[in-house]
Amino acid sequence: MARAMMKMPEDFLMKVSRLENKTDEILPRVLESGAEVVESKVRTNLSAVVGANTKDESRSTGELERALGTSQARQDKDGNWNIKVGFDESRSDGDSNAKIANILEYGRHGQAPKPFLKPAKSQSRKSCIETMKAKLESEVEGI
């Protein structure tokens, strides 16, 4: 059998070993920086579609836009870190904001869809990744 041995650069190994102890502190900050980019794009797209191109005058109260937010970064049972950009559930009229957002995104009988989430996801993907990479690099350099 052939045998191969690879050695990693020493400075890289030192960074990884220092990072090991602080990943629980660093990863939430990295995810939050990426979520800010996505949230701003979703907010921009949502503002553009709410009340636009309607037959009747818009009845928008602004509750959906105010309910948009980002959850805290949390670690699931498998050890993966997650953060969510979405809507709070409570509304003054009893409906959920997720339902209203779904109706806006996909439409319903007599109401054409006005997608804002899916375009925001695809438009902000690269900038989100770049922002998170830059934040991770700055956090690793700060160790």
Task: Show the residue positions of the predicted features.
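Short, Lys/Arg-rich flexible segments
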Residues: 1-84, 88-93, 98-143
